[in-house]
C-alpha cells in the first residue's frame, strides 16, 4: 500500500564498543519512497537478527528484510559493515539444488536485486568475503563506490568479480566542493527522491547521506556517519533544511549529581571524543542549529550512556538529550534506541494518512524500563503503569500502544542476585531495556 509518511526505523544504535545487551551496532532503514521498499544505512554485525527481534506489530508495519533494495555505507569500520554479507545471503537466496535447479537458475534476473553504495574499498570487501566463504546466490547485487579525487577505482573486470556481482559505477566527487550529488534516484510518491552525499571528518574516511524529495513537500532526511565535524555537509542540508537530522553522540559529560559514578571531566571527554573522530551531544545540537534541522535524533551512543540501572540510566539519557536540545535551540532532541521509529508525515491534503500512520505520528510507547525485572517485553508495557521514559518524544515511537496485544509477545524472566541476573525461563523475546546486568 502506498503511504505518504516517510519513516526511519533504527535497527542498531550503539557505538563501536557494542553490541551491548540492549543495543546492536549501527544500522537503520528508511521508507522514503512510499511504496514499501527500504533503504538501509550501515549494516553492522547482527543486523539480520535485528529484523527477527522486532516486537510484534498487529498491523504488520515492522520493516522486513525483503523490503531492502538499497544499502548505503558511511565508512569501512567493522561496526558499520560486518552484517552486509549475511544480509546479501538471505536477500539473494542460495543457489537452488535438485532436479529443478537448472530451470530455477534460468529464471535469475540479469539486473541486480540490491544496490550497495559506499566508500572506496566496499566493493573489494564484499567481493572477498563472498569468494572466501564460497557463497553463491540466486540473484545478483551491484556495488557503486563513492570516490574522493585521490581514490583509485576498484576493478570490475569479469575475471575478478564475484559470480553474482554486476559491474557498478565509480562515482567521483565534485572537484569543486568534494560532494557527490544525485548518486541515486528513485520514484517517490510525490516525484523523484534523490540521494546526495558528502565527506565528513572522522578518523578515517566517512560519508554522510541526504535523501531528499525533489517535489513538494520537499522532505529531507540527513543521516551522518561517525564524525566530529560534518560541516562539509552543510550545503546539502540547507534550502530546504532537513526534516530529520540523525547525528552521532558517541560520548557525553554527565555531571556527578546525575550519575554518581561519572568521574571524567568535560575536557578529558571532549579531547578523547575529538581524537577518535566523534561528537558530543552539544556538537550534534550545534550542527542541527546551523542547518535549521526540524527534528534531531542522536545515534551511535556509547556504552557509558546506555548501561546504567533504571533510575540513573533514565537521567543520563535525559541529560544527553538536554545538552543537544540546549545547543540546538529549535526543538527537543531525542536519543535513539533499537527499534525506535521516527515518522515524517506529508502535509499534502491529497494524501490522507491511515489511522495507523496517524498513531505512528501522534502516539508513542515510552522507552522500555522495568522496575522489577530484566528484560521487559512489549506486551508488559501495555498494561504496566511503571514503564516510564524521560520526557517521551512527540515524534519518536516504537509503535502505538494499540498495535500490540497482550499475550502476543513473550519475555524471559530474570531475578537479581549477588552475581547479577539469573534466568528463570526463556521464551521468544521482545525488545529489551537498556540496563546491563550488575
PLM regions and their residue ranges:
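A short, acidic, amphipathic alpha-helical segment used as a generic capping/interface helix at domain edges
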Residues: 103, 230, 276-290
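A structural motif corresponding to the C-terminal end of an alpha-helix
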Residues: 283-296, 326-331
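Conserved strand-turn element in the central/C-terminal portion of the radical SAM core barrel
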Residues: 270, 294-307
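Conserved acidic residues
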Residues: 69, 243, 294
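Conserved active-site loop/cleft motifs that coordinate metal ions or position small ligands
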Residues: 245-247, 296-300, 332-337
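Metallo-beta-lactamase
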Residues: 211-276
